């Protein structure tokens, strides 16, 4: 990693030894000096010449750096354990033609939830294949049950059981009414999901997912999203 300096810091700013995870901080001539006309962001990001990347990772040795996730996206269980959700999120999308986007959320909550954008055209085709009117309530129930099945393939008994730790799989699913695009600002210019905006916009959906009614994927909010 020469000529760049790298260190791994824990939440208290203590440098970590090889093999221990923490925030990746970098320093060197090729590291930015700060944000243009934004001293606050610069001060928050660069401390004593070290750029705090917001990435979680660890050094295997002096030459090998592993990046394992973003701190802002980390799932945090009620007991404080942390987990990077990107692998689950990517697989939910890649393994299903019915899911266009997915992010997971757990901020010391009772369980993890998923916020997904469905492929409505594929779901409507599925409903038509069952001989149902896609606009009917019966069809929408079938669509939601199908989305739940797409999540359940990673659970015990599913064909991809064991791919991810069971405790981090979503116990509830929020089906969102619109896709994520640059135009509605749910995607940034790099086509990455702006998690904060999604979570702020659909705060009511998320709160509902932590109720007995909302934990069942067949609920009023999800039906209204289809």
Predicted region positions:
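Solvent-exposed, non-membrane alpha-helical residues enriched in polar/charged side chains
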Residues: 33, 43, 47-48, 89, ...
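Conserved ATP-binding/catalytic segment of the ANL
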Residues: 4, 11-19, 23-77, 106, ...
């Amino acid at each position: 990693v020469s000529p760049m300096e790298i260190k791994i810091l824990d939440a208290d700013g203590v440098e970590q030894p090889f093999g221990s995870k923490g925030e990746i901080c970098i320093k060197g001539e090729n590291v930015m000096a700060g944000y243009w006309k934004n001293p606050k962001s610069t001060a928050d990001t660069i401390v004593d010449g070290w750029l705090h990347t917001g990435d979680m990772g660890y050094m295997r040795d002096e030459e090998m750096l592993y990046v394992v996730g973003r701190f802002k996206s980390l799932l945090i269980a009620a007991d404080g354990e942390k987990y990077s959700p990107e692998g689950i999120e990517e697989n939910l999308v890649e393994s299903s033609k019915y899911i266009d986007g997915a992010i997971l959320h757990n901020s010391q909550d009772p369980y993890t939830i998923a916020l997904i954008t469905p492929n409505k055209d594929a779901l409507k085709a599925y409903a038509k294949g069952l001989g149902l009117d896609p606009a009917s309530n019966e069809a929408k129930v079938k669509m939601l049950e199908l989305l739940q099945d797409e999540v359940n393939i990673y659970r015990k008994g599913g064909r991809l059981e064991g791919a991810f730790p069971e405790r981090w799989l979503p116990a509830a699913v929020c089906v969102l009414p619109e896709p994520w695009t640059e135009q509605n600002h749910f995607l940034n210019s790099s086509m990455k999901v702006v998690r904060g905006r999604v979570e702020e916009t659909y705060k009511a959906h998320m709160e509902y997912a932590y109720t007995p009614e909302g934990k069942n994927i067949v609920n009023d909010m999800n039906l209204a999203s289809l």
